[in-house]
Amino acid sequence: MAIATNAGFVELAKHATGTGSPVAWTYMALGTDTGPGNNDNATSTTLKAENTTSNGLQRTATGVTASVVTTTVTNDTAQWVKTFTSTATMTITEAGIFNASSGGDMLVYGELSPTAPMVSTDTLTLTIKCQFKAAS
């Protein structure tokens, strides 16, 4: 399940009003945390254990395809898709969408279930969606 973050809501308000300096979310990051609960709340600002090593699984905007798709109402969902190719051995357990190559604001956070054990030359295609809808 993906969790929208408070920092993401702030940036969405900037986008909606044209105030401040809103930046588009074009970066996808992967992490390896295995602790219970990880970052499963709206106050999260980072992945719990983001991979920052240059091994094909680090945060990037290269190759990330961002689009809008339909879930309930036409074009109500932002979607990011990226295929990562590993040059290392690790298990990916979490992912997030950011608006900067490091730091920045995290819009959504999600835990992978099942997790993705990776070895060199493995690929992982990840799709992250964020639907905009009224609270229920």
Give names to the regions the model predicted.
Residues 1-93, 99-136:
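Small cysteine-rich, disulfide-bonded extracellular modules of the LU/uPAR three-finger superfamily
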